[in-house]
Amino acid sequence: DPNFTATDDCTVVLRYLPEVSIAVVSGHERNMKVTEPIDVYIADKLFQLTSADRPTPLTNEQYSARLDGRTVVVFGGSYGIGGDIAELARAYGANVRTFSRSTTGTYVEKRADVAKVAQQVLDETGRIDFVVNTAGVLVRGELAETSEETIYSSTDVNYLAPIFVAQEFFPHLAKSGGSMLLFTSSSYTRGRSGYSLYSSAKAAIVNLTQALADEWATSGVRVNCVNPERTGTPMRTKAFGEEPPGTLLSSEDVARQSLDVLLSHLTGHIIDIRREEGPA
């Protein structure tokens, strides 16, 4: 029909199949119509750049119901976000075990240390329900001037450590139907000068989270990743010095929202945590 033009499927149906009923359903602003191969490519790029919605904040009663009697393991739990997550979980009745270099002499980048922690916690509590890894190091400097030792030490902590944690704790999380939480940085979307090691490792963590969510789906183990905006932690202060408090998230706020993610039914999601208002 060379004289017929239409910009949508409904017009075609009305013209050639007038006896067929057409229903109208409510859509969503995030719906995307895929009709051409390029649409699939665009959709994939949007998925890569779009953070998932944060889960609904839990009430005190819900925190207690989901944490009381459960075992939570936190790597990097001596201070900062990890320390605050541990404190919150403990307040709601969880059996919390924290591990770090400074408090327990645990090197999360060493598989033997991670395996030892898993067995120790299992012996002490009989189960492992939640695992959080907040351990990380922030190395600054031009890559061309970075020593091989620094490259290995940074990559070991920021990337290999989460892999070892995932491998060693997966069997225990599969038994409990548990959840693992990792952390990335806003630099994962685009590498930054002077942060090549850090930002590339954080991009890898995002990919690792998504891959593990697929691999673990049939085992009932969830894994998500939190991407907090600039947060007031000892690691950041050491790297950048004192900054105006109003420009940073508090580690307590990040910890509570991270706990919501850890306890949610989500898996494979990258959750942005941002300040609601305040100076840029």
Question: What label would you give each PLM region?
Answer:
Residues 1-64:
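Conserved alpha/beta core of the MobA/IspD/sugar-nucleotide pyrophosphorylase nucleotidyltransferase superfamily
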Residues 218, 225, 241-280:
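C-terminal helical subdomain
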Residues 166-167, 210:
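A short, exposed helix-loop element centered on a Lys and neighboring polar residues
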Residues 142-143, 150-152:
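Substrate-binding pocket helix/loop in short-chain dehydrogenase/reductase
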Residues 179-204, 209-218, 230:
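Catalytic loop of short-chain dehydrogenase/reductase
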